[in-house]
Amino acid sequence: MFTLKKSMLLLFFLGTINLSLCEQERNADEEERRDDDEMDVEVEKRFLPMLAGLAANFLPKLFCKITKKC
């Protein structure tokens, strides 16, 4: 009977550790997903002003060539 209790206690202990490790991995995965979303927002913020700047430089030249009023 004592050996049965000992093995059940060991299984319970190992199961608890296993669940704890799984929870830590799950939390780490969720944090990585959040970081990716934040990085996408930062890339969009950097990309749009650059695109607007290029358009501001390119559109007057294009308009000038199309209308031939340079």
UniProtKB/Swiss-Prot annotation:
Expressed by the skin glands. GO terms for biological process: defense response to bacterium; defense response to fungus; innate immune response; killing of cells of another organism. One of its GO terms (cellular component) is extracellular region. Disulfide bonds join 64-70. Residues 23-46 form a propeptide. It is found in: Secreted. It comes from the Eukaryota. Keywords: Amphibian defense peptide, Antibiotic, Antimicrobial, Cleavage on pair of basic residues, Cytolysis, Disulfide bond, Fungicide, Hemolysis, Immunity, Innate immunity, Secreted, Signal. Its main location: secreted. Residues 1-22 form the signal peptide. The primary structure of this peptide is identical to that of Brevinin-1MT2 (AC E1B241). Antimicrobial peptide with activity against a variety of Gram-negative and Gram-positive bacteria and against fungi. Shows strong hemolytic activity against human erythrocytes. This is Brevinins-ALa. It comes from Amolops loloensis.
